[in-house]
Amino acid sequence: MTKVLILDQSKSVRNILRERLEYEGFSAEAVENEAAASALCERIPFDVILSDTECKVPDAGIPFIALSADTSIDTAVKAVRNGAQDFLTKPIDMNHLLQSMLLLQHIVQTEIPILFQKIPTYEPYNPL
């Protein structure tokens, strides 16, 4: 089961996202600030973080999707430059969010492990 951390200052956004994601079969936790998110990331191995762009995502090496009420291109570009795998505007289109989550889940489970496989090293031929 994919574990999701929701980081948003709005209680209603946190509750709606948590309830919908749990309904869709995800395991979800929701917090309102960076300190709570960091503490939770130390205890739970999350697969993805959904974070409002106003919040700083914990530096835990976890892929994240940025959420924002600001629809400007500059905000989207800044989020992606800061490491977001996707950028969604509020109000959140749940179908788009679920598609993004499933794609990210696929990448994490299938493509990233390939990057960490040991690549055979080249050993030069030395007959002596």
Each predicted region: which residue ranges?
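The C-terminal output helix
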Residues: 102-115
